[in-house]
Amino acid sequence: FRYCDPIVGKDDLVIVISQSGETADTKAALEEAKARGARVLSIVNVVGSAIAKASDDVIYTWAGPEIAVATTKAYSTQLTVIYLIAAYMADKLGKISKEEYADFIKEIESLPDKVAEILKSKEDVQYLASKFYNCHSIFFIGRNLDYAVSLEGSLKLKEISYIHSEAYAAGELKHGTISLIEDGTLVVALATGKNLFDKTVSNVTYVTYSYSVAVIRLLCCIIKGLRH
């Protein structure tokens, strides 16, 4: 951010995100934005941290101490705050109706119950991990928001398991990425958006017939379950 001569000024808002509130690169970017006259809003977890103090405004995620290396708790709360900001802005600008805004907030409030439901699958996840823990490489694929989640999922897998992992946009799978997939490679396909579900399944089907048949079939069943 600092090295690309950012086009920001007094009419701009720069949002910086940091779990600890002490991240050196993020703090330097914050200082650069303020030097150019921009207003800075920080999203941090640690109260009274350097970034929080240096910002014009701050939203605390209140995730509590982050013990896990993968920082899943802090990441989830950061996303929640970003979604809430986006919804609030859309409402104030009249981009969504009051009913849509209310539905959005209702969905956010339902997240704890949905997380609890996912955690009920702990044994299934452990079973899958026991089958694939010795994979040489693991690839995550997804489209749009699923691609962003794939990037984060791949990062967390690397941090915790020390297994080589990369994430790719599902639509780009045939452009080079496919050359890295071989028998025994695990491909995790995310397909949570209804409008792009069939396209992602098409990617999965292509890899199924070409490479890791057993692995992809299993993941196909998971994806179909999500669809229904």
Which functions belong to the PLM regions below?
Residues 1-110, 190-217, 221-226:
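Glycine-rich phosphate-binding loops that contact phosphosugars or nucleotide phosphates
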Residues 161, 227-228:
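In a subset of proteins, long, contiguous C-terminal domains/tails are tracked
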